[in-house]
Amino acid sequence: MAGMYNQDGGGGAPIPSYGGDGYGGGGGYGGGDAGYGGRGASGGGSYGGRGGYGGGGGRGNRGGGGGGYQGGDRGGRGSGGGGRDGDWRCPNPSCGNVNFARRVECNKCGALAPSGTSSGANDRGGGGYSRGGGDSDRGGGRGGRNDSGRSYESSRYDGGSRSGGSYGSGSQRENGSYGQAPPPAAAIPSYDGSGSYPPPTGYGMEAVPPPTSYSGGPPSYGGPRGGYGSDAPSTGGRGGRSGGYDGGSAPRRQEASYEDAATEKVKQCDADCDDNCDNARIYISNLPPDVTTDELKDLFGGIGQVGRIKQKRGYKDQWPYNIKIYTDEKGNYKGDACLAYEDPSAAHSAGGFFNNYEMRGNKISVTMAEKSAPRAPTFDQRGGGRGGGGGGYGGGGGDRRRDNYSSGPDRNHHGGNRSRPY
């Protein structure tokens, strides 16, 4: 079918009276392996479909670039067209391996491809977003109308016919320009026997220059504009993210640290303390250097219950009394201690009972211990975990421990997002 639509297909068919290239070109559906790709040079051979360089056929196998997104299959398969139509069988009788169209030698035995099957894997036909994509016959480019000459941009104008181009396909242009505004429609061909087409207006005689940065996609995909950090708005149908990672998104909420708050002075206990004061600690000074914890517990436990500390596992005494005797760097007692009651009222009354009390020749002094600033709540680093909110595994924030004395692991915390088998 070298003359589909009165075109000159394979080698040497006469020029038809309709003007050279007309609508089809090189071979119609079967002849010349060129699809509708325009003026097939030497039919089925190397530069199939007068396009080669961007139009109807890649470089000789039936399919070739033409239209579609980036020549045939968006650049993925070179100019081999869609499918397996250009595959060739190894000429070696003992081999018989079927090779891909783009190979120039047998993948199995290394024999050279027979003449007429060389594929231009590097001439993919300009790609871009095309109305006219040559090669619709055998799974060709994903173009539009298959007019093969009526594309949006003819890359070359060399007197006779335009290459079955694609939008933005230059001659031997690898990656056609993505995302450019379509120019005005090409002029209707004049059937005056000459087969010539006027050059497209507004684009000159040369191919479209390649884009300076490969940051755009087809117009319908809306690729990111400006790489990874920009906030430029994206254009197009599917709406690519503007600016890549975190581009244009709201900044992460900054948690105010506890130190950022104005440190207000903690009110200390004095003679005006009422029943609402929760300070249960007393400070004892001028103690004898050999004082023991049991002595202080027996003495001060006469007016109230001395508090206990729930110790971690492994200690001999799991519930020691909450009494701290201070020592110096060498471990010697300094003569002062701190004791905590269970009831704050007992602590407030301890000074009236034991201040200036004489213990082995030393008059001890008993005052209310200073209240320290409240501790910052310990938020979990996961920011709320499974239950959201502030910290902790189930939200709610705050300290999830069972008391305020580092009481060991919380059995309800489960160690994060670990799965529980039972």
Swiss-Prot record:
Residues 280-371 form the RRM domain. PROSITE patterns: RRM, ZF_RANBP2_1, ZF_RANBP2_2. InterPro entries: Nucleotide-bd_a/b_plait_sf, RBD_domain_sf, RRM_dom, Znf_RanBP2, Znf_RanBP2_sf. Keywords: Activator, Metal-binding, Nucleus, RNA-binding, Transcription, Transcription regulation, Zinc, Zinc-finger. It is found in: Nucleus. Residues 1-24, 47-94, 111-263, 368-422 are annotated as: Disordered. One of its GO terms (cellular component) is nucleus. One of its GO terms (molecular function) is zinc ion binding. A zinc finger (RanBP2-type) spans 84-115. Residues 8-24, 47-83, 123-133, 219-229, 236-247, 382-397 have a biased composition (Gly residues). Coiled coil: none annotated. Component of the TFIID complex. TFIID is composed of TATA binding protein (TBP) and a number of TBP-associated factors (TAFs) whose MWs range from 14-217 kDa. Interacts with TAF4, TAF4B, TAF5, TAF12B and TAF14. This is Transcription initiation factor TFIID subunit 15b. It comes from Arabidopsis thaliana (Mouse-ear cress). The gene is TAF15B.
